[in-house]
From Swiss-Prot:
Pfam families: MutS_I, MutS_II, MutS_III, MutS_IV, MutS_V. This protein is involved in the repair of mismatches in DNA. It is possible that it carries out the mismatch recognition step. This protein has a weak ATPase activity. GO terms for cellular component: cytosol. GO terms for molecular function: ATP binding; ATP-dependent DNA damage sensor activity; damaged DNA binding; mismatched DNA binding. Keywords: ATP-binding, DNA damage, DNA repair, DNA-binding, Nucleotide-binding. ATP binds at residues 618-625. This is DNA mismatch repair protein MutS.
Amino acid sequence: MNPIDTDDLEKHTPMMRQYLSMKAEHHDMLLFYRMGDFYELFYDDAKRASELLGISLTARGKSGGDPIPMAGIPYHAVEGYLAKLVQIGQSVAICEQIGDPATSKGPVERKVVRIVTPGTLTDEALLQERQDNLLAAVYQGKVGFGYATLDVSSGRFVIAELETKESLEAELQRTNPVEILYSEDFGALDLLHHFKGKRRRPEWEFDYDTSIKLLLAQFGTKDLHGFGITDARLSLQAAGCLMQYVKDTQRTALPHINAITRFNQTDTIVLDAATRRNLELTQNLSGGRDNTLAAVLDNTATAMGSRMLQRWIHQPLRDHALILARQTAVNELLETAVHESLHEQLKALGDIERIMARLALRTARPRDFARLRQALSLLPQLQLSLSQLSAPHTVKLGQLLGEFPQEQQLLEHAIVDNPPMLIRDGGVIREGYNAELDEWRGLSEGASDYLVQLEAREKERTGIATLKVGYNRVHGYYIEVSRLQSNQVPLNYQRRQTLKNMERYITPELKEYEEKVLSSQGKALALEKQLWDELFDLILPKLHELQDFARAAAELDVLSNFAERAETLGYTSPELSSEIGVKIEAGRHPVVERVSQTPFIANPVTLHNQRRMLIVTGPNMGGKSTYMRQVALITLMAHIGCFVPAERATIGPIDRIFTRIGASDDLASGRSTFMVEMTETANILHNATAQSLVLMDEIGRGTSTYDGLSLAWSAAEYLAQQVGAMTLFATHYFELTQLPELMSGVYNVHLDAIEHEDTIAFMHAVQEGAASKSYGLQVAALAGVPARVIKAAKHKLHQLESRDHQVEGTKTPIQTLLALPEPVENPAVSKLKAINPDNLTPKQALDLLYELKRLS
């Protein structure tokens, strides 16, 4: 049966009717339906949960004549199961009992109180501590795309107008959202295939006017001019859908989402999806974090600092003034050694950014308030450390940290030193904060003393030495007497419970005290919950300032981390130049040097207006790809304000970094290895400029030798002569080493190797000039190719080389070989090009068809 079909509800039991009605409202997610100490799932939800979570699938009787598939999880273990589900892109609606079973005549009243989706998480138990948790929405217009992202756990809201599908792919790669909303007629679904949390939304949720109203209501403004986004129509439509989705799932006010910013590609160095992937910035080719640039650079003290660092890595700046502000701050931190004390102070700060989001949503827990209290108490120490610094950017961050003495004092006075995890059982509000609460607690907590006194008094009054006064949750307070002595009890003793050898009684005095104590416990809990809610009201007026504090602390963390990395790893401050070029002396690959078992060989690179392309040759395993990647990574690091692994680096303006490195099939899109290679090459040739850094590795190897050589030659020639991009062009086509003789600005460099008998040693040092040979057979032998195969390959190689020598005298120069004649155009095609269909009569059109037939 389909649990969403509510047409025949009368066939079912009252409880199942209640369930089916709620499921119909949340048909696109799993429904956790609270029954006692369990959350139950039914029908298809039960089957899916059983499969995804590995829990037992059972049946719960029948409803409507059919067995009901059922699966359940204990309520106290729900967070662990939720974590598993959101990691695989599932959403869950949590339905709680809000009525009293004792007074309910039919099914207990229930209500969906919480919706958990991958992109709207704020609970720290469900979040990846050092990764942004982005919800995204994408909308396709007639021309271009609108893209919006929101991190509900921080309040960061960003939009982008993207002109091409390739730009959208790059943004998806950069932001890596955990949940994506897209419209019903979205035409680029192939870009979303590997994302888990995809949600198709109705077209009306992207309505422009509705979106504007939603955003204005959220920000409390009359218009959006102050955000500089009024012309971003498509991305505002995406933002509106996103905002509505968050309101529907959170079901509460969202005061921490108080601004929206626009991401402009012109402000940052453009990195397309292939470049981000090939350079392994924050994710390696296997999908993990090991051996990435982020893994090397990230020694941040806080999780919020780590997340900011990863955003910086994916958004290298173009504005030299902004970069220099960061560099100056890092340099001062390093020279004064203040980064050491800052690191320790920030480590104790915690993840204030996410704590503030939970506070804004009123889902913060007692320990969140305790952590906020600790963070505020550290502010004077932080400010003292910063007082030693004078760099303008650092001074500005110090001002943003702010001061919050009243809020700190409030939390010191209100919250106990080590609060419990949850408010529901009490014990969170400190004694002395509220006199009425202390009074109710005193009544409750004084029960033990009262019972001891009552027991002593009753023993003396009755003469029953074995008399005891006790309490249990079922029967409450009682006076216990052995059955043998029960005939000695006074007349005011009323029997409450009979046991095998004991009788339990209650007296009017004890009954009255019981009611008073139980009432005081309930009143104490209710008052404590009220005081807890009031704490939110007292802190929230400072929400914006506390968010500024969190952002400033995160940036200080990143900058002090850069200083520590520079000191520990031997990095130097790069020089930024206004002249186009990249000059690196003794550069090192930041990742490879950390994982290599042998000393890393540093290498230089020089690119400028008169030296725009390097043809890089050398053996496989010789280090060509490592060399090219290190140039790109050093350039990128310089543009995020980080010091770089080199003795010296001077880098001019860069608008884009392109890489065509490595090869793999794209099976999901039906593209072969060669097709992927050519698509990436086409993107580079179309979009590279004279200020771009281009890395091209082994172009043309996925097809026949002459096809591949022709493509590689033409691509290199186009980049050198038409585009003028700064290019490293690695190849095994030795014919390409003739390019420097044919055009200016092109130079050969190579990585060499030394042969000794049947072994080979790679030098990994870059030298001017072309390589002498490729050493392919030696590398194959190192890889373990059978000796018989290597021997046969050597024999075949000698045959081929001998044949080449025999025709040496008639050998055609490569430029002549590649200068193929232009194909002659078919006369029918020429005729078609000359036709103007608007000027033809029907008779002329028919005559023309016969003529075209003859010409073809």
